[in-house]
């Protein structure tokens, strides 16, 4: 497959529906679901019983988002072991825990290492990655629903020039297969009626961090070339789908309330200009993300979702603080092109961040209530569940 860049400056990419309160994707996994996953993986729980327990967790995630008033909801990624789990579970060819182990840290300097996947054989899509997630949510709620997917750029981190060489001597062939798989998934979701697809790409921010840039080089991947290639891959994946809102989520790592990168968006603002996404969901909960000035590079027909509410810390932000920061951002991006969300998911990995279920609910309610006070009641078409 040949990847070509897209000149987006002269084209309009307005989103089909404006959502003022959003959720990035993952929600905390209840203890009973974690236990069930352990028993299922140990062969102590049947597939049918595990599916029943997963369904219960998704039903609870849907109910949580509905009662807190979030405009558009997800299944909480309850069926995934990590935000990228849908790729690893649905596509053959990965060693689940044999890849580049990136250290996550917090403000105290405490670290943990997350073993990640690595491609070791030719990729083969065994089943759709997100179709079940979307169709289940659509059947259970009258609210607008979205689906979250890994980006090709994130999957680039699962290539190792030594461990992957037997299947893919060069990274380009691997990434071409990844793009084809992800593009097929987008087409399937579109066919099923999904109107909002979010692409998760925290590895863009990894390209800001000197240590992580060196990690890419050591694995045969030029980080500077990867930035331009990644925007091309993103455009190839989402293609041209009128009536579909595509969002891009950028953060700096999210694992058990720890992160792996810092730095403002300045060095990667070409992502705003060169991709087709109508909606950018950006982490902005603390000083690690820098200021709002890079938002000047966002084209005038795009929406910026300000991730001002921390999903890493239990302390609840004040509405006054959020409104002040929204006002600051509106000096750069007009208010009618802004929205509000948590800075990331609450459980990008199954362990989840260091918050309680009550903390999570309070944060989601804060997002929804603040959005309504700033932008008014949403004008969103609801539907009867299928």
Spans of features found by a protein language model:
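Domain-level signal for soluble alpha/beta catalytic cores
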Residues: 3-386
């Amino acid at each position: 497959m040949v990847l070509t860049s897209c000149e987006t400056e002269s084209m309009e990419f307005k989103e089909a529906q404006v959502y003022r309160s959003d959720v990035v994707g993952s929600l905390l996994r209840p203890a009973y679901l974690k236990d069930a996953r352990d028993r299922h993986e140990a062969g102590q729980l049947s597939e049918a019983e595990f599916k029943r327990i997963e369904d219960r967790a998704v039903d609870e995630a849907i109910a949580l988002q509905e009662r807190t008033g979030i405009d558009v909801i997800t299944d909480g990624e309850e069926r995934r072991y990590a935000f990228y789990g849908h790729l690893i579970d649905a596509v053959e060819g990965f060693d689940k825990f044999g890849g580049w182990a990136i250290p996550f840290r917090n403000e105290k300097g405490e670290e943990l290492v997350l073993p990640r996947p690595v491609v070791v054989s030719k990729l083969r899509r065994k089943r759709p990655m997100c179709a079940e997630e979307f169709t289940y949510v659509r059947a259970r709620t009258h609210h607008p629903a979205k689906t979250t997917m890994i980006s090709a750029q994130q999957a680039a981190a699962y290539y190792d020039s030594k461990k992957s060489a037997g299947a893919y001597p060069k990274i380009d062939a691997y990434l071409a297969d990844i793009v084809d798989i992800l593009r097929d998934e987008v087409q399937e979701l579109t066919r099923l009626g999904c109107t909002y697809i979010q692409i998760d790409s925290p590895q863009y921010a990894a390209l800001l961090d000197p240590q992580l840039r060196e990690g890419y080089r050591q694995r045969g991947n030029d980080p500077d070339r990867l930035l331009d290639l990644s925007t091309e891959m993103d455009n190839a994946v989402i293609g041209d789908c009128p009536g579909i809102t595509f969002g891009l989520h950028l953060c700096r790592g999210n694992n058990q309330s720890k992160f792996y990168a810092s730095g403002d968006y300045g060095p990667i603002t070409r992502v705003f200009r060169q991709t087709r996404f109508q909606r950018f969901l950006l982490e902005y909960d603390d000083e690690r993300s820098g200021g709002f000035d890079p938002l000047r590079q966002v084209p005038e027909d795009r929406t910026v979702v300000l991730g001002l509410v921390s999903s890493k810390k239990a302390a609840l932000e004040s509405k006054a603080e959020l409104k002040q920061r929204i006002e600051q951002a509106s000096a750069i991006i007009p208010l009618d092109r802004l929205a509000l969300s948590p800075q990331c998911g609450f459980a990008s990995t199954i362990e989840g961040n260091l918050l309680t279920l009550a903390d999570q609910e309070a944060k989601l309610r804060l997002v929804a209530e603040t959005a309504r006070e700033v932008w008014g009641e949403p004008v969103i078409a609801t539907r009867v569940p299928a």
